[in-house]
């Protein structure tokens, strides 16, 4: 606790027995990732983890399709990862196991629940920032 003495102009600090937690601020650059996960072909994911927060930047090249490029690594019939993020360039179509399709493009914020396939549309790479990358494109078992 601090008190100000207006007569002397001094601040008196009294140490308390209470515990205080200092706020922590940490910054990392995605261009120096902790890990780069290469897909079977057609791209990769750069992954940075700070504490319990993980962010990935997925670069999906033309011709990329989850069922061709990640399924062999994941070992599941469809992607079982929940993705939340934003598309910054390119276009990707996502098809849920129930047949629902949604396309995302630059500026689109998305939530993709587990149980989907996806592919790049067009001849431009699709770049996504995704908070669901901690388990993505990692071998199961």
Go through the PLM ranges and name each one.
Residues 65-66, 90-95, 118:
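Short beta-strand segments in beta-sandwich/barrel cores
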Residues 97-115:
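Short acidic-glycine-tyrosine-enriched beta hairpin
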Residues 58-60, 85, 110:
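Conserved GNAT-family N-acetyltransferase fold
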Residues 76-94:
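Short, conserved beta-strand element in jelly-roll/cupin
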Residues 57-78:
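Conserved short histidine dyad/triad with adjacent acidic residue
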Residues 31, 62-64, 133-141:
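Glyoxalase I/VOC metalloenzyme domain signal
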Residues 113-138:
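Ligand-binding loop in jelly-roll beta-barrel domains
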Residues 3-59, 67:
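A short, N-terminal "cap"/entry segment at the start of jelly-roll beta-barrel domains
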């Amino acid at each position: 606790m601090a008190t100000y003495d207006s007569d002397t102009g001094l601040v008196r600090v009294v140490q308390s027995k209470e515990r205080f937690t200092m706020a922590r601020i940490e910054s990392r650059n995605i261009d120096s990732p902790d890990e780069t996960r290469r897909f079977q072909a057609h791209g990769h994911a750069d992954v940075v983890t700070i504490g319990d927060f993980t962010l990935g930047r997925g670069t999906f090249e033309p011709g990329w399709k989850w069922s061709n490029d990640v399924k062999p690594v994941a070992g599941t019939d469809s992607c079982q990862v929940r993705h939340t993020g934003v598309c910054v360039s390119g276009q990707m179509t996502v098809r849920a196991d129930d047949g629902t399709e949604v396309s995302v493009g630059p500026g689109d914020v998305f939530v993709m629940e587990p149980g989907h396939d996806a592919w790049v549309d067009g001849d431009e790479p699709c770049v996504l920032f995704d908070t669901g990358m901690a388990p993505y494109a990692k071998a199961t078992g």
